[in-house]
Amino acid sequence: LGDVYKRQGYGGSCFPKDTKALNFQSDHAGVKLKTVKATIDVNREQRIKLIDKARRFFPDFRGVRVAIIGLTFKPGTDDLREAPAKQNIDILLNEGASVIAWDPLGVENFRKRYPDCAINFAENIDEALTDADVCFIMTEWEKIVEYPLDNYKKYMRRPLVFDGRNCYKLSEVEKHEIFYDSIGRKIVDTL
C-alpha cells in the first residue's frame, strides 16, 4: 500500500475480511505473518488518524460542530462496510460533538444500518459545511474533488479541513485561505 495508497485506511467487504482471515489462518497453522498483523493494526490506527490530527485544535470535541463529507468506504457505492466514517462519528459523538454528514449515496443506507446514530444529514456539501468548526473528508466523491476550495472559507466558521482521501492538490489548496491536513503530505496553513 505505502505511497500508492496514502489514505486514512481501507474498508469495504473484501480486503478487511481477507486480511483478518489470513491472519486467523496463519495463527491457526502456527505461522506468524507479522506483515499481515501489522497491516491490520496500522489500518485500525489510520481510520481515526484525522481525529488525532484535529486534536491540535480540539483536545476534545465537546460543543464542536463537525462536518463529515462522505460516509461510504469508496465513491460510487452506498456500501458502508468497514468505512472509516462510522468509527470517527462514534468517537465524535462520545466526546460531545454535533455532527452533520453528507454523502450522495450513503445517507439512506447509513440511516438503516445505524438508526440510533444521533447525527444530522445535509442535502449538499454547502449545507454540511455551514457553521462547521471542522470538516473531515472521508470519501473521495467526484463532487468533493471538484468542490470549490473557496467554499470552505465561505461556509465554515474557520476553514479547518482534514482530508482522509487526499482529494485536493496541495498546489491548489495553497491558493486559498484554509488549513488543510491530509494523509502522508505536508500541512497547508494559509490562514
What do the PLM-derived regions correspond to, one by one?
Residues 3-191:
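Structural/interface elements that position substrates and couple domains in central-metabolism enzymes
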